Amino acid sequence: MEPHGETDLVSFAFSSPTPFDPTRPIYLDAQNPSRAFNARQFRLLVRSLIAGLRALGLKPGHCVLVQLENTVIHSALFFAIVGAGGVYMGCDVGSPAHELTHLLRLAEPQLVITAPGALSTLEVCSTQGESFSGQVLLVDELSIDNIVQFAHRAAAAGAEAQTEGLVDQTAGPCIRLESLLQHGESDWLRFEDREQSKRTPAAMFLTSGTSGLPKAAISTHHTIISHHLSVHYRVPYPVVRLMALPMYHSFGDFWTNIFPIRYGEPLYVLPRFDISTFLDAVRQHHISETYMVPAMVQILSQSSLPVAESLASLRYVGISGAPIDGFSIQRFQRLLSPDAVAGNLWGMTEVGVVFQNRYRVPLQFGSVGTLLHGYELRFVDPATGEDVAGTPDSPGELYVRGPGLLLGYKWRTDDKDEQGWFRTGDMVYARDGNYYIIGRTKDLIKVRGQVPDSLNSWTSHSTNRLCDSRYSVAPAEIEGILLKDPGVKDAAVIGVMLPDGSSEVPRAYVVRAGISPESTADQLTDLVQTQLASYKALDGGVVFVDEIPRTGIGKPHRARLSQLDREREKLASILGVSVPA
C-alpha cells in the first residue's frame, strides 16, 4: 500500500509516484476519442476552472451540485470544485422534481452545473417551495467541445492567450460553463496537515435511498485519499479503464477521478450503459479493466450479441453495487478470457470499499473477497446487540471502523457510535478469510415455517436464533435462483405479509426475457422449491412486470417495489380479484 501522505486531495491526485508520458491522453470520450485530455491539458483545465469558480464567488465550504451525464470533463469539474475549496455533490441528470427538491434542501448548493434538458425540472422545484437562488451553469455538447479545444490550445500557448472563441452568453438565468475559462489560472487550496485533511469536506455522495430519500454522506480529503489507497494495487497488465457507471456515485468515483492523473492510466467514458456502445468501446479501445453492477452482468450474460468476442481484452471486472449470486458471476466469467477475473467486491458510500476480490487471487464464488487494509470489523447479533463469531453458523450484522469512514451525514448525527463504529445494516459471515454477504437486515424476509429439510447452509440453522424463532430469507438468494432460468431477464424479491398476519413470505417480481416458450409462475415457483429450503418458497407468488425499479447504481428499489405491491393489492381489493396474478 502506498504511503498516505498528509495532504489535500488535489495535490495527492496530481503527485504521481511514478513518471508517465504527460502527452498521452488519459481522460477520453469513448464515443469520440478526439475529446480527450492529457496530463498537461487536464492540469491547466483544472486550474482555469478553479479561477473561474472563484471569480463567480465560490468560497471554501460552498457546495456545487453537478447534475450531468458522464462526460469527459467530469473529473476536471470534480477537482476544480474541490481545489477551489468547495464541496462536490453529484446527482442524476434525470432526477425527478421531488428528488431534486430534496437535494437542494439537503445540500444547499451555491452553484448548480446542469444540462439544458434538466432546467425545466429545476424550475419545477421552485413551485414546490424550493426556489434555487444560486447561479446555474449550463453544459451542452458545444460546451464540452469548447472546453476540450480550450485545453488543447491553452496547453500549447498559455491559458490567458487562448480564451478567444469561447462562447460567452447567458441562457436566461444561466451562464455557460466555458465562460469560467476567461479568468486565467489559479492554484488549488493546498495544505499539508493531517487534521485539516481529516476535517475538511471535499465531497458529499448520496446514499442509495432504497428505503427512502437519499442521505448526503460527507467525505473529507483524507477519506477519499484513504478510499483510493485501499483499492489500489499493482497488476501485471496495462490498465485501460472504461466507465459506464454513474461517475457522480461513490462507486464510480473510486475508479474515475484519481487513477488517470496519478498513474497515467487512460479512462474512457461513456455517458451511460448501453450494451451495444459498451461492447463497441471495449473492443475498439482494448479495455483491460471495468466495473459493473449486477444488472449489467445479467444483461451481458443473456445477450445474443457477440459478447465474448467483444470482451476479449478485459483482464479484470469489478462487480458491486447490489447483491449478486455465485452462479451469475460464474456464468459471466465464462464469457471472459481465461486470463480475466470477474471479482465481486463490497463497499458502501459511507465506508468505501471494505472487501475486494483482486486479480489472480483465488476466487471463492459468492464471496465479496478479503478484507482491505485499514479496516476493522465486528459482527453483532441484531436482536441482542452482542458480538457474535461471524461464522457461517453465527453470522452477524457488520460494523466497520477505519480511515475510510464518512465524516458524517449532512444535517444528521446518526452516522457512527462513540467508538467510531459504523453500522452497515448488512448480515455477513466469514469463511477461510473470505467474506459473504447474506443481505440487508431490513430486506431479510422473516418467515415462520417448518424445520428445513437440510441444514447445509447458513440460513438453515442460525437465523431462527437471530430473528425470534423465524427464519430469515435473503431476497438475493431467491433472485439468484430465478435468474438461472433463461426465460427470466430480471427479478426482485420482497416480503409480503400473509392475510392472517402470521408470517412474511417471499413474493417475486419477474421481467420475462421475451423468449418462447415463456416461463410460467408455476415453473418459477417449482424452480425455487427444488433448489432451496421449503421455507424459502415463493408462497407470496410470482408477479410478471415490464421493469424492476432500480436505483441509479442498479440496486433493486425494494421500498418502491413494496409501495407498488401495496397499491396493486389495494386495486385488486377494489376490483374484487385475487393477487398475485
From Swiss-Prot:
Instruction: List S-S links within the chain.
Output: none
List UniProt keywords, sorted A-Z.
Answer: ATP-binding, Ligase, Nucleotide-binding
Reactions listed under catalytic activity: nicotinate + ATP + CoA = nicotinyl-CoA + AMP + diphosphate
* CDD domains registered for this protein in UniProt: Firefly_Luc_like
Q: Where is this region: AMP-binding?
A: 477-555
Q: Does the keyword Protease apply?
A: no
**What is the protein's applied use?**
Pyripyropene A and its derivatives have very unique characteristics of selectively inhibiting the acyl-coenzyme A:cholesterol acyltransferase 2 (ACAT2) isozyme. Therefore, pyripyropenes are expected to be developed as a new type of anti-atherosclerotic agent. Furthermore, pyripyropenes have been shown to exhibit anti-angiogenic activity against human umbilical vein endothelial cells. Finally, pyripyropene A also exhibits insecticidal properties.
**Which GO molecular function entries does the Swiss-Prot or TrEMBL record give?**
ATP binding; CoA-ligase activity
Q: Which Gene3D superfamilies does this UniProt record tie to the protein?
A: 3.30.300.30, N-terminal domain of ligase-like (3.40.50.12780)
Name one matching Pfam family.
AMP-binding
> Pathway membership of this protein?
Secondary metabolite biosynthesis; terpenoid biosynthesis
E.C. designation(s):
6.2.1.-
Q: Which residues does UniProt call coiled coil? A: none
Residues that coordinate or bind AMP: 204-215
Q: Can you tell which superkingdom this protein's organism belongs to?
A: Eukaryota
The processes (GO biological process) annotated in the record are: terpenoid biosynthetic process
The broad enzyme category this protein falls into is: ligase
What the entry lists under InterPro entries is as follows: AMP-bd_C, AMP-bd_C_sf, AMP-binding_CS, AMP-dep_synth/lig_dom, ANL_N_sf
Q: Which family does it belong to?
A: Belongs to the ATP-dependent AMP-binding enzyme family.
Q: What does this protein do?
A: Nicotinic acid-CoA ligase; part of the gene cluster that mediates the biosynthesis of pyripyropene A, a specific human acyl-coenzyme A:cholesterol acyltransferase 2 inhibitor. The first step of the pathway is the synthesis of nicotinyl-CoA from nicotinic acid by the nicotinic acid-CoA ligase pyr1. Nicotinyl-CoA is then a substrate of polyketide synthase pyr2 to produce 4-hydroxy-6-(3-pyridinyl)-2H-pyran-2-one (HPPO) which is further prenylated by the polyprenyl transferase pyr6 to yield farnesyl-HPPO.
User: PANTHER family, per this entry?
Assistant: ADENYLATE-FORMING ENZYME AFEA, LONG-CHAIN-FATTY-ACID--COA LIGASE
Q: What is this protein called?
A: Nicotinic acid-CoA ligase pyr1
Organism equals Aspergillus fumigatus (strain ATCC MYA-4609 / CBS 101355 / FGSC A1100 / Af293)
Taxonomy of origin reads:
Eukaryota, Fungi, Dikarya, Ascomycota, Pezizomycotina
